[in-house]
Amino acid sequence: MNTIKDNTISIITGFQGVTAGGDVTTLGRGGSDTTAVAIAAQVGAERCDIYTDVDGIFTTDPKVVPNAKKLDSITMEEMLELASQGAKVMQTRAVEFANKYNVPVRVLSSFNDGSGTLISQKDESMENSVVSGLSLIHI
């Protein structure tokens, strides 16, 4: 973190961390998202952008339900619920960390231009919504 604070360009692996004892460890599935959110929180970034293989957060898995709708925005609480129920677009720990440190996250496609989906503490557009999304678990 010192090199980042000194305005030095830093190359950081996305799924590794250091334990309290100083040992390098891997963070598991979604570790790159967690790393990005942690760094954004540490440096006081106004937002953390996560680039992935989808255009944002959808009402359900668009690979399973072709007419699923992309959400322009969603609350941290709603995203935590979707992630904990199996939505794979963001790992639960990354969303929990973003929520804890109030770091808005924008999920964008690595392959397509677009506005993606903003995940934040409060979402005015969803104020009167009953259902934001549906997560499917394949058994």
Model region roles, listed by residue range:
Residues 1-137:
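C-terminal catalytic "cap/lid" subdomain
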